[in-house]
Amino acid sequence: MLFRSARDGSEIVEPPSARVAGLIAQSDAERGFWFSPSNQVVTGVLRPARPVSWAINDPNTQANYLNEFSVATFVSHDGIRLWGNRTCATDSRWAFLSVRRTADMINESLVKAHLWAVDRNITRTYVEEVTEMVNAYLRQLKAQAAILGGRCWADPELNTAQAIADGRVYFDFDFTAPYPAEHIVFRSHLVGDYLEEIL
């Protein structure tokens, strides 16, 4: 729960879901859907209804404890920030919200962008055009740093003569999403190697 100001100056407690949705929409518009909303300032909020301990250099805080159990929270540091990257997925590939959202966006975009391809004649040119359109989209996402890479292909084992005769054509694609730097570790090493540079 979060506190915000009412028009009359009083404070109102509200659930954070609308603020988080707004933060995600703002992040999508300003940075891209592939960025994590974690560590971003939530606007229009005075403070969390229940303070959560947090320090940038202390892993043993309430905020980090909650994050270990896939619970995002809010912390106070130069504003009220959403703190937490993780989903409740049991499959570790989908543990980060930004990775899940990237996959969803790619899948939805491909379906919408290929409405033109439904009910077209399945020819070699058709298969090549669809494959190249998907690959062009994946290259564009890579150029934007939305993904690290990806590729589309038509698998001949699935696209049998019978499948094509039944009006089915299969396009596989893969991609790698960038993962958020949830834990940054700086390791300090005191050495005498640079003493020689004094003279």
Where are these regions (language model features)?
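Generic alpha-helical propensity signal that fires on short helical segments
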Residues: 36-42, 51-53, 124, 170-172, ...
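C-terminal edge-of-domain segments
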Residues: 159-199
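A generic structural signal for short, non-catalytic loop/turn and secondary-structure boundary residues
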Residues: 68, 145-147, 164-166
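Helix N-cap and loop-to-helix transition residues
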Residues: 58-59, 123, 160
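Acidic, low-complexity glycine/serine/threonine-rich segments
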Residues: 95-157
